[in-house]
């Protein structure tokens, strides 16, 4: 799959560039007209399940043949802020012509008009140590603190624990990195003083070590198995915090680096190592060194 959607202003083609929550291009609509839909969802964060429906956004009549793509050829007439001086005259055109046109062009996905029947929860928790990320440093920190009796919360944004260990060839303690991570997670889950959460994103860090975490509980399950709340919002007060969320590869700047077929090397490696997906057979690798 190369063409996922279209960009906001010029309707340029967009494909998958990353393999996680940092995805800027592959934005889709989840659901259909007969159910509750969720706009502006990153395709790289959606786990496949039976009955999943997703569609491209910001394109008409289809993503392959998008009328709005003409904006890309007329880009010289649409510089930044062009609307502040273009739609000034005549004044009588504003409410009936200009404003409806601008409002129709604005936005990205389509907000659902249906009532959200899903259940949502919130929870308050306290811990001695909150750790974001389950890579080698996060797991080592959680294990050491838990062994010393500390109350630990380990949060991992993705569905699988291990972080960089999932794509590397390193060994830890005479074990393969992935096996070491699996063993540590198994031990942590058995400890009564440890809370281990995957699909949980810590997105807010406030005064006095108050952190907010969003846990996706049943987003990855088919409708027939969605008995639990859809999401849970955690308010966590921590004595200490370890941020071990890893790094994000910085894309290099060159012409048309926003189009389908351009993907970060770290993402290509993760798709191959974790999901068994080959992103291409004849790649051109561009590095900065």
Task: Please name every model-derived segment.
Residues 1-289:
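Residues forming the flavin
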